[in-house]
Amino acid sequence: MSDTPEIPDTVVFDAEPLVAYFCDEPGSDTIEQYVDAVEGAADGYISAINLAEVQYIVRAIDGEKRANAVVDVLAESGIRRVDTEQTWRLAADFKFCRSPALGDAFALGAAAHVDGTLLVGADDDCHDITAVSITRFRTEPV
């Protein structure tokens, strides 16, 4: 991956990139650049479903207090939650047509809803999706 990613104007975060960022996994430095961009001029979003994933995964790794702090930091950084009321039909369409994991379907739905680029990790649920712009921050799973 490039040291300096080209940051789109609108970024939708899947859970994996944010878990990598907050848990200092490989690629966290790349995600930091995306978060910094959202704190600047870029628009950042996360599906409510993916936010729940971030919270419970960080909680399992670092505890409840840290997980709640992560959710607060995301809100303060300007990453806006996209609620399921806005995206459930889009997520259902992605799930029906491509069978990604449900969390990935909601991430795709959020990206379609805000016309943004979905930032994902190494999982292959989005590999053949062309209806939404997708950027991978890493190619190897952790």
Model-derived regions: residue spans:
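Acidic, PIN/NYN-like endoribonuclease modules and their adjacent C-terminal/linker elements
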Residues: M1-P5, T10, R80, L108, ...
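A general alpha-helix detector
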Residues: E53-V54, V73, L90
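Short glycine/serine- and small hydrophobic-enriched flexible loop segments
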Residues: Y56-R59, A112
